[in-house]
């Protein structure tokens, strides 16, 4: 059986190789995803300045009140919708999707679909 530490180490290694190719700018910032066992987090980052422009997670008060579980696909879709809504309010319409070394499957894919539903393009 593969140990969890080794799996996470391989994910970080994949993420570093992805980050060599993906770079967020002011015109098209980077939508970065991180997931833990119980929560999922998303940030929109301008890499030129090194600033987080918008952030959302299952820990936000808006979502904690409505979500029954924070670790399922429905919660990830709601986080995607929330970050999309916040980005549109700030004038961000196009982003580069950074899956964080995770497979584009399950919660990561649901977050992306939720962000697309809210109006983000990537």
Swiss-Prot record:
GO CC, alphabetical: cytosolic large ribosomal subunit
Keywords associated with the record: Ribonucleoprotein, Ribosomal protein, RNA-binding, rRNA-binding
Key word Acetylation present: no
Record flagged with keyword Metal-binding: no
BP GO terms, sorted: translation
Gene Ontology MF annotations: 5S rRNA binding; structural constituent of ribosome
HAMAP family hit by this protein: Ribosomal_uL18_B (MF_01337_B)
PANTHER family: 39S RIBOSOMAL PROTEIN L18, MITOCHONDRIAL, LARGE RIBOSOMAL SUBUNIT PROTEIN UL18M
Similarity field: Belongs to the universal ribosomal protein uL18 family.
Record's function text: This is one of the proteins that bind and probably mediate the attachment of the 5S RNA into the large ribosomal subunit, where it forms part of the central protuberance.
Record note on quaternary structure: Part of the 50S ribosomal subunit; part of the 5S rRNA/L5/L18/L25 subcomplex. Contacts the 5S and 23S rRNAs.
The protein, known as: Large ribosomal subunit protein uL18
Organism: Thermosipho africanus (strain TCF52B)
């Amino acid at each position: 059986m593969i140990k969890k530490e080794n799996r996470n180490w391989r994910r970080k290694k994949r993420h570093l190789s992805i980050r060599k190719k993906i770079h967020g700018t002011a015109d098209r910032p980077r939508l970065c995803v991180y997931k833990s066992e119980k929560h999922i987090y998303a940030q929109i980052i301008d890499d030129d300045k090194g600033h987080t422009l918008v952030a959302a997670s299952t820990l936000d008060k808006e979502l904690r009140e409505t979500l029954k579980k924070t670790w399922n696909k429905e919660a990830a879709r709601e986080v995607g919708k929330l970050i999309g809504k916040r980005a549109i309010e700030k004038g961000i319409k196009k982003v580069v999707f950074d899956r964080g070394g995770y497979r584009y499957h399950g919660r990561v894919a649901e977050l992306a679909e939720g962000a697309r539903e809210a109006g983000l393009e990537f």
